[in-house]
Amino acid sequence: MEVIMNSSIVKLPNKYELVKDTLVLILAGGRGSRLYELTDKRAKPALYFGGNRRIIDFALSNCLNSGLNRIGVVTQYAAHSLLRHLQNGWSFLPAERGEFIDMLPARQQIDDSTWYRGTADAVYQNMAIIRDHYCPKYILILAGDHIYKQDYSQMLLDHIHSGAKCTVGCIEVEREKATEFGVMAVNENLKVKSFVEKPKDPPAMVGKPNTSLASMGIYVFDADYLYDVLEREVSSPYTSHDFGKDILPKALEEGVLYAHPFSRSCMGRNTEGEIYWRDVGTLDSFWQSNIDLVCENPQLDIYDQSWPIRGNPVQTYPSKFFYKKENARPVDNSLISGGCVITDASISYSVLFDRIKINEGSQIDHCVVLPQVTIGKNCKLKRCIIDRHSVIPDGMEIGVDLELDRQRFRVSSGGVVLVTPSMLKKLNGEEVASEAHLD
């Protein structure tokens, strides 16, 4: 395809050439501090989601579905479970065809620093490998901790057609929630006119006083431009080594920053045509995003085979339900993964991961239960997140009396109760030793 740019005819690559010349970098080193104990021993991208997936599976699946198969995963905090997941579930790309998912852990490279100092520094510290070994023309940078379906090839096409050197993915959000994002304004050609990172008073969109245009943390760069701007930025005494705070403002200042609306490349909309993108960075948002999946027509369709979300499901026996009571309605509007054993218990509006045992008389209502949990007899759990390997003793009630729960567990601002094995051990007076979290 040929277009006119700056009074010259330029031949643009087609989609196949474009994805072949693109390296994807997934930033997966975040701790997720607002998830508290849920990410104490695992990186946020390694957190379970949707019954038998992990959060990073969405970014990785989007890449493969978009035709992108040259991928680097940049890791840092508590990376062991993430690395095991990638090795066990994502090692199938054929290296002989130039396809790969490589791990890029934080390590001593440029100077004596061993930790990445920010999102931009995570790329800068690996720049020699990227430039000299992978040799891309374009670099797609993704966050590894968001839930969504997107065709990145469309964003890449928009990037080259606009003549941008940097393109940022954007989505409309409620203005009152935009304080957690970078917020921008664009002209009719989607060239970014202003950008501010996490403003206290987010600017509204023209004609939409209650809506702001927010960054999704997804960026496409011309590789040569990214190398240049990172080299210049690292020498600045005022840099915070962050894409939103430093790199995007620099691209804006130089007039090469464009926006890509998520609506142009969103995949898997529901029957109402709604787009879906979630940052599950809090206990409430993590719980709600999982519970949303149990409704009849969820915004996120995890059963859509036209845009599949791959993962590393555990090999288990089928789940078993055993009920002695007649006319019982044991399971209602719930997701139940493999290897679960449910005996005379009621489950409603809940997501159960693999290998969970629930004993007779227990009631599970609006709960997200992570793998290998045992729930005793006659328990009552409501609006809970139960972390992996937890053992709930007979007769325990959680989510019924939030004041009592605040003394025993962690209660979110939205009234969701987080329960972990360590909390239960402390409650029983057991000593809690520091232990590796192999999940």
Swiss-Prot record:
It comes from the Bacteria. Alpha-D-glucose 1-phosphate binds at residues 116, 182, 197-198, 215. GO terms for molecular function: ATP binding; glucose-1-phosphate adenylyltransferase activity. PROSITE patterns: ADP_GLC_PYROPHOSPH_1, ADP_GLC_PYROPHOSPH_2, ADP_GLC_PYROPHOSPH_3. Pathway: Glycan biosynthesis; glycogen biosynthesis. GO terms for biological process: glycogen biosynthetic process. Keywords: ATP-binding, Carbohydrate metabolism, Glycogen biosynthesis, Glycogen metabolism, Nucleotide-binding, Nucleotidyltransferase, Transferase. Its EC number is 2.7.7.27. InterPro entries: ADP-Glc_PPase, ADP_Glu_pyroP_CS, GlgC_bac, GlmU/GlgC-like_hexapep, NTP_transferase_dom, Nucleotide-diphossugar_trans, Trimer_LpxA-like_sf. It catalyses: alpha-D-glucose 1-phosphate + ATP + H(+) = ADP-alpha-D-glucose + diphosphate. Homotetramer. Belongs to the bacterial/plant glucose-1-phosphate adenylyltransferase family. Involved in the biosynthesis of ADP-glucose, a building block required for the elongation reactions to produce glycogen. Catalyzes the reaction between ATP and alpha-D-glucose 1-phosphate (G1P) to produce pyrophosphate and ADP-Glc. This is Glucose-1-phosphate adenylyltransferase. It comes from Pasteurella multocida (strain Pm70).
